[in-house]
Amino acid sequence: MKVIVLLLVLAVMQPVIQSQPFPGTEELPMTRRPPKGELEYWCTYAKSCDFCWNCRHGICKNKVFEKHPLIKKNDYIQICRVSRYNNRCSYFTDSRIRRFHIMSCTNPTYYDWFDELMQVKEDRVIDVENIKHTCLCMIATIALIGYVRKQYSRMRMQAATRLLIFLGLYVLLGILMTNIIMNLPLSTDNPMQMRRPPERDLKFWCTYAKHCDFCWTCKDGMCKNKVFSDHPIITQNDYIVNCTVSRWHDRCMYEAHFRIHYQHNMNCSQPKDLEWFIELKRHVINQDDL
């Protein structure tokens, strides 16, 4: 009985297996435009590559799979280059961080490189911010310790006692400086540019900089607002952009890192809501017309 069931399953699966796309057998030099007859193959396993999409007025339609829903043009669609040598197929993505995937042409595997690409970009941004904060902490701490050491050198103490006090103050000041700089509330007057504002300040920033990426949690192309639970879920596109926020006394500023640099200044105590995305797109359109 089990053998009969297995044969029936194989009989049903055979048309599906036979319908799987396979590329040509000849070598394919590195190219941005694979042969039209191979599009079904490449767009099955490298579906985010630009040669799989026709885009017009910001709306993109899949060239191969007609039932695929229309999507908005965003950084999910990347410029790709594909090649084939013997039985090895590979595709490369041209982005800030180059990614590539090599697979067997006759036994390909789907690789969701976009999710990994976004994670790598996010980790790299966080690492850079942490390095900046660490360097600032070290400079400030060394300056303070130098002053404290100079003062204690004038006091009559045993060398061991003086050393212990010096090391204790060094550790204490280092911890305090790190906590202060990494968790600046809105009430402080210290300037600091942050990729991720403190969680307690999210409501403020996401009210006046609602398009910034730190206000959204995105998964599988759908984004949910972190602060306002009644906000409808939206699709992930270039409406959501990378932002950094900073403040100086009562001046709050957020910067949008889009195709051009854009920033908005406002009073922290009397903030002004600005639809900066519309203004940003207007600048981009004007630049494209030049």
UniProtKB/Swiss-Prot annotation:
B repeats: 161-290
Keywords: Early protein, Membrane, Repeat, Signal, Transmembrane, Transmembrane helix
The keyword Transmembrane is assigned to this record: yes
GO CC entries: membrane
Family annotation (InterPro entries): ASFV_fam_110 (IPR004848)
Coarse class of the protein's main subcellular location: membrane
Membrane in keyword set: yes
Residue spans of the A repeats: 1-160
Annotated TM spans: 128-148, 163-183
Disulfide cysteine pairs (residue numbers): none
Signal peptide: 1-19
Compartment(s) where it occurs, according to its Swiss-Prot or TrEMBL record: Membrane
Pfam families: v110
Superkingdom assignment: Viruses
Membrane topology: Multi-pass membrane protein
Similarity comment: Belongs to the asfivirus MGF 110 family.
Name the record gives this protein: Protein MGF 110-9L
Native source organism of the sequence: African swine fever virus (isolate Portugal/Lis 57/1957) (ASFV)
